[in-house]
Amino acid sequence: DVCSSDLSNHMCFSVPKQDSLFSGDHVMAWSTSVVIPPDGNMADYLASLALLCSRTESRYWPTHGPPLDSPHDYVQALIAHRLQRMQDIMQLLKASPWRIADMVEQLYPKLDVRLHGAASRSIFAAILYLQDCGEIEALESTTLDGLYQKSS
């Protein structure tokens, strides 16, 4: 069995005889995956996480980091984290338009500056998702440098 992952060419593979799943970069015990548009799509990523929640494997083997035992609660927490991050973005946009770089500063105040690029791309993936849902709109172009506001 396979499911798509954080990028279109990343997959998860089940090993039923070992009650295990090779989760690749999709689910890692030490970090969340960075969903990078245009190849990475937040809707696809969330759907894949939901699919994993319906599966029964008791151990995940990520590409990076230690194995993850009893992964289902962790996968549910990953979904909750992504949904909360999108709520955080919507909260920022309630008052005024924002650029992604400014959102990174606000949402990740203690993040090492070397990781701001990854955080920006993750926020951009969330923005594209929210834009597809009709929740937000671009005031300029839909890019990493664009200006975004809550849809009117």
Model-derived regions, located:
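Metallo-beta-lactamase
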Residues: 5-88
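Extracellular interaction modules
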Residues: 1-2
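C-terminal regulatory/interaction regions
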Residues: 91-152
